Amino acid sequence: MVIEKKINTASVSLKSLDPLDHSLELLHFGFRGLTVAADHFLEARGLSRVHHRILYVIARADAISIGELATTLGVSNQALHRPLSHLFEQALVQYTREPGRHRFKLLALSETGTALEAEVTELERRTLREALATTDTDGQDAWRRVMLALAEQLN
């Protein structure tokens, strides 16, 4: 569910307990700003951000098993079951059996799933493109270095 209430982030008066708190708030609100248009688009179709994460990863994998998908997303197979089943029911995701290892399902997007994933991801790209346009190349590179350093915490 997408919360409709607008937030003026400049007027949010949270007490800082540490000098980095403002940066944490910007990261939180920035991510919400990045995904809000996509979240509305998905919600109108009975889907959510978790469905988009699944579609996004499958679209970029040549062939991915359910276990590999769960590992990539950082969730358990059990946590993946319900949203993935929903995507199967909506015919957005399909599977084939892995040759020689018939227990394993290899996931792929259907034509409809491919089109939906592309449209949702483009909404996020557009938002990111607009935000990156507010700074120069050095600022964009610095932002990418910070994001990379944060992502490295997963390794």
Language-model-derived ranges and their functions:
Residues F31, Y56-R60, T121:
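Short, locally clustered residues in the helix-turn-helix/winged-helix DNA-binding domain
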